[in-house]
Amino acid sequence: MQADEISSIIKERIDNFELDVNVAETGKVMAFADGVAKVYGLKNVMSYEMVEFDTGDRGLASNLEESSVGVVVLGAGKNIKEGTSVKRLGKLMKVPAGDALMGRVVNGMGEPVDGKGAIETTEYRFVEEKAPGIMQRKSVHEPLQTGLKAIDALVPIGRGQRELIIGDRQTGKTTVAIDTIINQKGQDVVCIYVAIGQKESTVAQVVRKLEEHGAMEYTIIVNAPASDSAAMQFLAPYTGVTMGEYFRDNARHALIIYDDLSKHAVAYREMSLILRRPPGREAFPGDVFYLHSRLLERAAKVSDELGAGSLTALPIIETQAGDVAAYIPTNVISITDGQIFLETDLFNSGVRPAINVGLSVSRVGGAAQIKATKQVAGTLRLDLAQYRELQAFAQFASDLDESSRKQLERGQRMVEILKQPPYAPLPIERQVVVIFAGAKGYMDDISVTKITKFEAELYPFIEAKYPQIFEDIRTKKMIDKETEETLSKALEEFKTVFVA
């Protein structure tokens, strides 16, 4: 081999030489217990930055102290021990978003847990995102129908609203949420159901119900079950809302349900106490209000300049023995735009959905209600309140005057009309027709026990003989003189058939 050949080979080698060095800031675990690692080093780590242990586990830098960092481990972290090496990843947490997630079940970090393979998406978004400001928003003005008569007529929800569902355990809170998801079929609304600290079997049941009704194809489920670490339960709602924001920011509509935020607060309390943050009322940390406010403020109706998309939130809170004045319930009530209050007594007496009409309000939904519903249900709230008052009075007074007795009987029928079986949401035009029938006295002489049968037979009758009524309410979104006359005629005709 010639000398010049050798020198050219050496030159080529030098030219092609790449120094492949990875520079990463590292630290060492000083102590690890209850899913939290105390790490020495990582001087320049950011708050909530992702870090990686050499065991492969990942964590979030939560407490930034002078000489150490409190890292919340995501997952079990079984192999982490004192002396384990930790390195900064230099990035904040991101989760997948987009249409590829529909029909899937993911964990608190957005990883699939349904055995249907990887999620094919290129869209990743930051979990912690600032909520839209005042100028980026628009007031709530389009209805988001739940398919439940008691809600759509009395506590209407609009797109971009936050409406709290609150009640004791076993009062049908999740059922209201599932009904709302089922009712979004064909409405072009993407639904996200976040299960926090639930039993795996309960979540499996929810998935099965949604599949039965063909609702899973437009639904994403984020599941952080009771067996998951507190950190995963804390993360799940933020993961869910990040997925929802993708649709909101792309001029589409989404609905997110947090089931439930009581367990979310408990998971955060557990995390904070392990991180040795000072406890406050009910041992919750001082920033538990901010925990929920920064989450719920991300639900919004976005301005026309930004595409007029929306993200509607239905947080659920579980109360203890009806105590709405506890810390977390009052916090969330003050953050949301109204609440649907479910009562054990009503549930047990057969009024389902067990909505207490007196305590439930919707602070912005009225602007989103369609005119037809306003026309038939305008005085319904007041009538029901007067009925409740009369009912209490009638227990003691035996002799009631004629008008009071009529009011009582009408009230009983209205309560009966507002009852509804689970997982059977009603289209708005049917709701309008049946509430019209009740409010205008077409059911006054029908026995209370036959109201359900009356309602069940009324829809097919109108569908067969007067289909124009449903069509008009659907398209005009109001009852004009002509529709009212046709509807009155149809009800008179149906009543003679029904009574006979």
Swiss-Prot record:
Catalytic activity, EC: 7.1.2.2
Keyword Mitochondrion appears in the UniProt entry: no
Residues of the site described as Required for activity: 360
GO molecular function term, any single one: ADP binding
Signal sequence extent: none
Compartmental location: Cell inner membrane
CC per GO annotation: plasma membrane; proton-transporting ATP synthase complex
HAMAP family reported for this sequence: ATP_synth_alpha_bact
Family label: Belongs to the ATPase alpha/beta chains family.
Subunit structure: F-type ATPases have 2 components, CF(1) - the catalytic core - and CF(0) - the membrane proton channel. CF(1) has five subunits: alpha(3), beta(3), gamma(1), delta(1), epsilon(1). CF(0) has three main subunits: a(1), b(2) and c(9-12). The alpha and beta chains form an alternating ring which encloses part of the gamma chain. CF(1) is attached to CF(0) by a central stalk formed by the gamma and epsilon chains, while a peripheral stalk is formed by the delta and b chains.
Role summary: Produces ATP from ADP in the presence of a proton gradient across the membrane. The alpha chain is a regulatory subunit.
The protein's name: ATP synthase subunit alpha
Source organism per UniProt: Wolinella succinogenes (strain ATCC 29543 / DSM 1740 / CCUG 13145 / JCM 31913 / LMG 7466 / NCTC 11488 / FDC 602W) (Vibrio succinogenes)
Protein encoded by which gene: atpA
